[in-house]
């Protein structure tokens, strides 16, 4: 019977703009010797105004500002994912970029809903956070794994 290992990699493990992803790949390759590995990923970190910040904190701030009527801009998140995209092989880059754009658009729409309704809570907040963080990062990591021949 094959062992099953579940490994969770939080934002700190992923690093700012995906800097530590190569270490995660090494770790997973090591873990999968004689075991099946299920990897779970949190939202990554990024650098904002010279400080390391979590995507979660940035999206919560964007949501709070949207609630007050500010038009949401996800440029910093997109820039961070573009840096992470460099870890995806050219075979999958365009497809992965489309996935990133699609998820970030869903997050932007949720933030725009918050702006229009004046409320950033519940389902709107969940959509904004999930589509910019954990769900998207899991998709991006899948492309990185494919690029590395990891299944």
Set out the residue ranges of the language-model regions.
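Nucleotide/pyrophosphate-binding catalytic subdomain
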Residues: 1-151
């Amino acid at each position: 019977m094959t062992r099953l290992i579940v490994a969770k990699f939080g934002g700190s493990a992923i690093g700012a703009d995906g800097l530590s992803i190569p270490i995660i790949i090494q770790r997973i390759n090591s873990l999968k010797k004689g075991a099946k590995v299920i990897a779970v990923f949190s939202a990554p970190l990024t650098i904002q105004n010279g400080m390391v910040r979590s995507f979660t904190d940035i999206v919560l701030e964007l949501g709070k500002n949207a609630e007050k009527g500010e038009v949401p801009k996800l440029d910093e998140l997109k820039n961070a994912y573009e840096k992470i995209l460099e870890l995806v092989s050219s075979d999958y880059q365009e497809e992965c970029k489309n996935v990133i754009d699609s998820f970030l658009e869903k997050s932007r729409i949720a933030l725009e809903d918050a702006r229009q309704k004046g409320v950033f809570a519940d389902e709107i907040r969940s959509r904004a956070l999930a589509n910019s963080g954990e769900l998207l990062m899991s998709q991006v990591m899948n492309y990185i794994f494919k690029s590395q021949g990891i299944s």
